[in-house]
Amino acid sequence: MDRDPSEEDSMADLSFEAESPVLPPDELLEGLPSYDWLLQGRERQVFFPPLEALGRSQEPACWSSVLEHSRVPVVTEEVAREALLSFVNSHCCYSSAAAGNLIIQELRQQTLCRYRLETFSESRVSEWTFQPVTNHSVDGPQRGTSPRLWDMKVQVPPMFQEDTRKLQVPHSSLVKECHKCHGRGRYKCSGCHGAGMVRCSSCSGTKRKAKQPRRCHLCSGSGRRRCSTCSGRGNKTCATCKGERKLEHFVQLVIMWKNSLFEFMSPHHLHCPKELLAKARGENLFRDENATVYPIVDFPLQDISLASQRGIEEHSTMLASRARILQQMFFYSGGPFHHS
């Protein structure tokens, strides 16, 4: 295939293609607050201190009134038998005869209590990225100083709904030539090395198949075929800059809203698999939600009180250095468990 020699000079050889830069251009960092940047391994990433959560002015709930109005129901023999029959009927191959005629001699009741703490937090990090330059205007340092990432106003999703968003940091863009194609927009095809043609795979370039007098029908006797990688053009559009020759480097803000969960179940002596107990539904006896919640300090069950303190401390320690706590919510639930 004939091509203009000037086109040959304007294409980069794929074998000498540049690797992606490890660090962003120095010019990109000059307009950013230096104390916001931390060097982690071979990548630069922003790690900002969280904003302090708003304090609470309310007093802790009175647990005596909560317990007074929260009565755990008592399961009778009739209720227990109905529950057993309901379980049997939910399985196609189970017989209800044994469940119906079963003699229940004794019902021993235990109350299983749960404490569940959910903490909704927001963390912000930054990453350097780039994209092909298009017709849109470039928002560079000449338009102002880039704000600190925690100063950027972002709409918070509904509480306890996890989400991730990525935003371009204002005034952080910088245009440079593409590091992959060296600003040419394309490079030589690796399949044909820029020739546009490759050796015929059917006749191996001999123009005829072995022990056959006729010429190869795939290459029409030429011994070469059009390169399928580049469709015979001899070059490919640079996948990094999409042929635009230049890249816009900028800092990208990554905001992550996540839920952290802490659960505790009161000690029990039930001979029941943990996975079944986890699925059992109790009654929510109390629920509290605020920017920060109090640990339970006056609850009759000391295990629940200690668990609430431990859960709040764990979440505070875990999130203090890397996130901002937006909202906390805890549930106290209880339910009767009977075995005969």
UniProtKB/Swiss-Prot annotation:
Subcellular location(s) per record: Cytoplasm; Nucleus
- Annotated phenotype, changing residue 141 to Q: Mice carrying this mutant show narrowed dental pulp cavities, increased dentin thickness, and abnormal tooth attrition, as well as anomalies in the number and organization of dentinal tubules, indicating dysplasia of the mineralized dentin; the width of the predentin zone is reduced in heterozygous animals or null in homozygotes, with significantly increased numbers of odontoblasts in the pulp cavity compared to wild-type mice
Tissue specificity is:
Widely expressed, with highest levels in the liver, intestine, tongue and underjaw.
A cellular component term from Gene Ontology for this protein is: cytoplasm
What are the protein's UniProt keywords? Cytoplasm, Nucleus
Q: Where is the composition biased (Acidic residues)?
A: 1-11
Specify the domain of life of the species encoding this protein. Answer: Eukaryota
Which residue intervals make up region (Disordered)? 1-20
User: What is the protein's major site of localization?
Assistant: cytoplasm
Q: Name one GO biological process term.
A: odontogenesis
One GO molecular function term of this record is:
heat shock protein binding
Q: Outline what the protein does.
A: Plays a role in odontogenesis.
Q: What is this protein called?
A: Protein SSUH2 homolog
What is the organism of origin for this protein? Mus musculus (Mouse)
Lineage of the species this protein comes from: Eukaryota, Metazoa, Chordata, Craniata, Vertebrata
Originating gene:
Ssuh2
